[in-house]
């Protein structure tokens, strides 16, 4: 149990409250830029290939100094170092938190309970690479001798969101002769649509479940097995050539019919939402190849080292985490928008939703006390420019404080025609324009100068002062994707450390799963389920009455 003062009673916290109520009671970005001609150059930080411009935030040098004092007081750096050392900072499950070990170099030494875990990590990576090369080259064939043309990844949560996001992000680097599809929802329509046009003889299923008991995943895997056997004359031997497992439960894997030689393990010190650079990334490795996958890992490691070694004033994940605390706790912001100006990052924000909201969606601190401060925000967003024609109206003229990240790349991906590549300038013009419009808005006088009728002026005025971070990189590559993900991983860590919550458990996921197991017999068999509230009992009854048999 900690004997340190509660967060909101720390002097560093109250100083920030006073700062917000005093000099930053009514912050104006136009005034902040006018007062500091070098602001645009000074408020930039670099991490690897990423350039972060945070000049359009409602902060001053004093704000940054006070936030850094809060980080020091809450021992963000001590907890960071403990994580990298392999200490068990996941206090509710008594586990180490070592997703960083998944991208450590071969010669690194990272111990858990006295054992260096790095050799095991690289042993699995080497096995993954061998298997991926065999599938990609056609050496690995299906039961009938046909080459594998489609990989179907079946998982849920971290076993789906990460690989699916990265596959879309790196589609330009994939082997176009082989495609990957992802199935996660226990809704049978998900699997149906994924396999309806596939040839079982050319399909490989990757089943991702650490325990091999995850109900949604095993339900889908069992249905996929039935689909496969129906298409291959019911020969049970076919399963071993068309299914591989990402799991640690050899018994369950073997019972399913999968050869345990094709089971790829991972460890309990890797949380699901941090796991796609482990064996969970096998489908991605098959798609982009082992060399590109290792470039992805290198990108992760670049920002890991940046977070571990960069000074506070130049530490990008620390800065993003502090800004999130600033807006959530001192401006009342309830959400955070992540707006990538890249079609390839169409699933990036959905991935960050789990990373951030499952990590920091907590209401008790590490000592089990209810928190008295805001914790994790709602994370949302879609790629630009689509969002501009949907919800940017609220960002520009709504009443809520919504910090946003604008993510863009200076160069388009290779492989586009000259005409399509030229559209990239228009895409990025929109990114830069939105950052300016959100920050500086448009005054009434500026509107009047355009000859707008006076009665229209209030409707066409934009107050600005909407904070954004602009993140730029030269182009979207496997390494840059790894850097982006690690940037957000460590940002989430910083916020959890300041809020004194356990960012690495997810007990909130469990309750609904337990109740679903109890409710299902009432739907399928009409069994009585004790403990149902009247509303849920009535819903179950209505379902049974109208369910088609």
Curated annotation (Swiss-Prot):
Listed InterPro entries: G6P_Isomerase (IPR001672), G6P_Isomerase_C (IPR023096), Phosphoglucose_isomerase_CS (IPR018189), SIS_dom_sf (IPR046348), SIS_PGI_1 (IPR035476), SIS_PGI_2 (IPR035482)
Pathway: Carbohydrate biosynthesis; gluconeogenesis; Carbohydrate degradation; glycolysis; D-glyceraldehyde 3-phosphate and glycerone phosphate from D-glucose: step 2/4
Pfam families, per the entry: PGI
Cited function: Catalyzes the reversible isomerization of glucose-6-phosphate to fructose-6-phosphate.
Protein name: Glucose-6-phosphate isomerase 1
Active-site annotation: 358, 389, 513
Subcellular location as annotated: Cytoplasm
Gene Ontology annotations of biological process type: gluconeogenesis; glucose 6-phosphate metabolic process; glycolytic process
CDD domains the UniProt entry points to: SIS_PGI_1 (cd05015), SIS_PGI_2 (cd05016)
Single GO MF annotation: glucose-6-phosphate isomerase activity
Lineage: Bacteria, Bacillati, Actinomycetota, Actinomycetes, Kitasatosporales
Reactions accelerated catalytically: alpha-D-glucose 6-phosphate = beta-D-fructose 6-phosphate
Alphabetical keyword list: Cytoplasm, Gluconeogenesis, Glycolysis, Isomerase
Key word Acetylation present: no
């Amino acid at each position: 149990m900690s004997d340190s003062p509660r967060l909101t009673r720390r002097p560093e916290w109250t100083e920030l409250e006073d700062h917000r109520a005093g000099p930053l009671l009514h912050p104006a970005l136009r005034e902040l830029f006018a007062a500091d001609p070098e602001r645009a150059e000074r408020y930039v930080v670099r991490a690897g290939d990423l350039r972060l411009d945070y000049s359009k935030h409602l902060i001053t040098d004093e704000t940054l100094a006070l936030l850094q004092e809060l980080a020091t007081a809450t021992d963000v750096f001590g907890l960071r170092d403990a994580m990298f050392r392999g200490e068990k900072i996941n206090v509710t499950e008594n586990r180490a938190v070592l997703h960083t070990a998944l991208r450590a170099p071969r010669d690194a030494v990272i111990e858990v309970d006295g054992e260096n875990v790095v050799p095991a990590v690289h042993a699995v990576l080497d096995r993954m690479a061998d298997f991926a090369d065999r599938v990609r080259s056609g050496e690995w064939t299906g039961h009938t001798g046909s080459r594998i043309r489609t990989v179907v990844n079946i998982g849920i949560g971290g076993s789906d969101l990460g690989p699916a996001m990265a596959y879309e992000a790196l589609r330009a680097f994939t082997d176009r002769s082989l495609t990957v599809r992802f199935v996660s929802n226990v809704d049978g329509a998900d699997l149906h649509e994924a396999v309806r046009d596939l040839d079982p003889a050319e399909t490989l299923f990757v089943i991702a479940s650490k325990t091999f008991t995850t109900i949604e995943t095993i339900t889908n895997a069992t249905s996929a097995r039935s689909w496969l056997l129906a298409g291959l004359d019911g020969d049970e031997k076919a399963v071993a050539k068309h299914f591989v497992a990402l799991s640690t439960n050899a018994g369950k894997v073997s019972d399913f019919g999968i050869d345990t030689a094709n089971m790829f393990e991972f460890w309990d010190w890797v949380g699901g939402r941090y796991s796609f650079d482990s064996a969970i990334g096998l489908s991605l490795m098959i798609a982009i190849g082992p060399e590109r996958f290792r470039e992805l890992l290198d990108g992760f490691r670049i920002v890991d080292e940046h977070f571990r070694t960069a000074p506070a004033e130049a530490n990008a994940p620390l800065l993003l985490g502090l800004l999130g605390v600033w807006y959530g706790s001192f401006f009342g912001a309830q959400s955070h928008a992540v707006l990538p100006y890249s079609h390839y990052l169409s699933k990036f924000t959905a991935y960050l939703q789990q990373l951030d909201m499952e990590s920091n969606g907590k209401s008790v601190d590490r000592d089990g006390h209810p928190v008295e401060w805001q914790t994790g925000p709602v994370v949302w967003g879609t790629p630009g420019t689509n969002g501009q024609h949907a919800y940017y109206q609220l960002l520009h003229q709504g009443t809520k404080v919504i910090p946003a990240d604008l993510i863009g790349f200076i160069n388009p991906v290779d492989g586009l025609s000259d005409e399509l590549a030229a559209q990239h300038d228009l895409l990025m013009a929109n990114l830069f324009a939105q950052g300016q419009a959100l920050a500086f808005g448009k005054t009434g006088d500026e509107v009047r100068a355009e000859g707008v009728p006076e009665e229209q002026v209030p409707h066409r005025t934009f107050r600005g002062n909407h904070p954004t971070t602009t993140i730029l990189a030269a182009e979207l590559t496997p390494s840059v994707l790894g850097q982006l993900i690690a940037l957000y991983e460590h940002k989430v860590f910083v916020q959890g450390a300041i809020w004194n919550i356990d960012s690495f458990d997810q007990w909130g996921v469990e309750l609904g799963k337990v109740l679903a197991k109890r409710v299902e017999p009432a739907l399928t068999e009409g069994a009585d389920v004790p403990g149902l509230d009247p509303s849920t009992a009535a819903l179950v009854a209505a379902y049974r009455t109208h369910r088609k048999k």
